[in-house]
From Swiss-Prot:
Gene label: CAMP
InterPro entries documented for this protein: Cathelicidin-like, Cathelicidin_CS, Cathlecidin_C, Cystatin_sf
Post-translational modification summary for this protein: Proteolytically cleaved by proteinase PRTN3 into antibacterial peptide LL-37. Proteolytically cleaved by cathepsin CTSG and neutrophil elastase ELANE. After secretion onto the skin surface, the CAMP gene product is processed by a serine protease-dependent mechanism into multiple novel antimicrobial peptides distinct from and shorter than cathelicidin LL-37. These peptides show enhanced antimicrobial action, acquiring the ability to kill skin pathogens such as S.aureus, E.coli and C.albicans. These peptides have lost the ability to stimulate CXCL8/IL8 release from keratinocytes. The peptides act synergistically, killing bacteria at lower concentrations when present together, and maintain activity at increased salt condition.
Any one GO molecular function term: lipopolysaccharide binding
PANTHER family: CATHELICIDIN (PTHR10206), CATHELICIDIN ANTIMICROBIAL PEPTIDE (PTHR10206:SF2)
Stretches the record annotates as Active core: 150-162
Family under the similarity heading: Belongs to the cathelicidin family.
Protein name, per record: Cathelicidin antimicrobial peptide
Length: 170
């Protein structure tokens, strides 16, 4: 009686399983991170290198720019982080920490690679200057509206007095 073990199919399956076993570690090593995962890793690196007392957590991730498909090419990133209530000395994920009320907000820009094996980050952070720039824009627009409003009021006053006719005594 002939069994499955005697046939060539067992040898083929063994070869397929062997090839799969050899290629699986390569797939794990060459794992490609998503844009958000790469930024979260960058935040972890920032927390490790920071001399501030508390951890920072991702507050806002600016929209992903259009990028090429090469995970080894550095990708531009822009995001804000905010100080949390968790001390940097404890081993805790920043996502587990609440934001500190009136905590420091930093705007970060730089590049990351999506290839986890490369793990390349070039990020610099400053106090959130965009808020100051946004305030400047708001003040400029408000000033322009005030000037337009004053011009309109001036024109109305001019029109009002222009319509008045001098009174003559009879």
């Amino acid at each position: 009686m002939k069994t499955q073990r005697d046939g060539p199919s067992l040898g083929r399956w063994s070869l397929v399983l062997l090839l799969l076993g050899l290629t699986m570690p390569l797939a794990v090593i060459a794992r490609v991170l998503s844009y958000q995962e790469a930024v979260l890793r960058a935040v972890d690196v920032l927390n490790q290198r920071s001399s501030d007392a508390n951890l920072y957590r991702l507050l806002n991730l600016d929209p992903r720019p259009t990028m090429d498909g090469d995970p080894d090419t550095p990708k531009p990133v822009s995001f804000t982080v905010k100080e949390t209530v968790c001390p940097r000395t404890i081993q805790r994920s920043p996502e587990e920490c609440d934001f500190k009320e009136d905590g420091l907000v930093k705007w970060c820009v730089g590049t990351v690679t999506l290839n986890q094996a490369k793990d390349s980050f070039d990020i610099s952070c400053d106090k959130d200057k965009r808020k100051v720039a946004q305030l400047g824009d708001v003040l400029q627009k408000a000033g322009e509206k005030i000037v337009r409003g004053l011009k309109n009021i001036g024109q109305r006053i001019k029109d009002f007095f222009g319509k008045l006719t001098p009174r003559t005594e009879s």
